[in-house]
Amino acid sequence: PASVALSAVTVTVNGTNVTSAFAADPEGNHQLEGVVTGLPLGKSKLVARAAGPGKSRRHRDSLTLTNHDIQGPMFSGPRQVPFVCATPNNAAGLGLPPIAQSETCETATVVSFRYRSTTNQWLDYDPASPPAPSTIQQVTTLDGETVPLIIRWERGVINRFMYSIAMLSPASQGPAPDFSAWNGKLLYSFSGGVAIGHTQGAASSGDMLHLAGLGLGYAVIYSSGTRTNTHYNLQLGGETAIMVKDRFVSAYAEPEYTVGVGGSGGAIQQYVYGQNHPGLLDAGVPQYSYPDMVTQTIHVGDCELVERWLDSKVLADPLSPWRTWVNRTLVEGLNASAVIPNPYAPVMPYMPTPGSSECINGWRGLSP
């Protein structure tokens, strides 16, 4: 209440005084702000009390805080098993140590530096023996500052998936982030594809090191857990996105805004996470996305299954009506033709060639 001086408020967590972690709101609101670290896993009770005399002593409020393990889960449910870790053999080329790991695929966080060469390659940058400045590309950020394209690149594991944080680092290449060329904005790079999980996945260097975004001064975050080519559990993906962004906010800074970017499954994630987790994304750039989620995902889910069923009928009976391409339209509701080439003809010798269906040309091979 306005009647209580902020200096009279005491804050405790599980009975321990943490008042020193809080300060007055810099925007002038009558409230305290702060970050409490070192919480145990599970639930903790935060209590705020007014320490002044008289009635102000009656002012007391509490909040239950739940601290989750960095490998989750928070709300996505039991972990999927079996689950294959990809970092022990360094399959993703992340530079993570190839060591035996726990069932959560946890490994040490790695920070290194790279630069974009004038030959359009990402190369390792050694601060102790830097390359000649003339071999490093120059970029101009949104703020109009021209700097060498040198980046700080953090990789590790969050929620069992590989994550990446990259940002320009032209002024220094030390342990602490260099904010000199950061435009204050965050880009979340989402990826598409289709998969059923059970693996940590593979990371995309193109998505992790989003060249256009980095060159403009954005910080770029990424996770193999927000790549639908790893899994299509959007509860798990949303949870992972929250945790990866929280890592950036905690270890770097609060961005002015966060914008998503990505195509196909990367676009769908932006729609769903924007709907389910307000505040995670402030804007999105969904690319080659579906015009609507209700009618278009029918083909994604059904085409592969229907085509396989029709194929099974032809394999069982070479005289099956489903060996005639145009008949498949009766079931699928999509075009079929006896003159269009079939990209899968080598593995479909039981079907006449040429000939194909819209289901095959558009969606076959998409499902795992």
Enumerate the predicted regions with their spans:
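C-terminal His-loop and adjacent cap/lid subdomain of alpha/beta-hydrolase
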Residues: 2-368
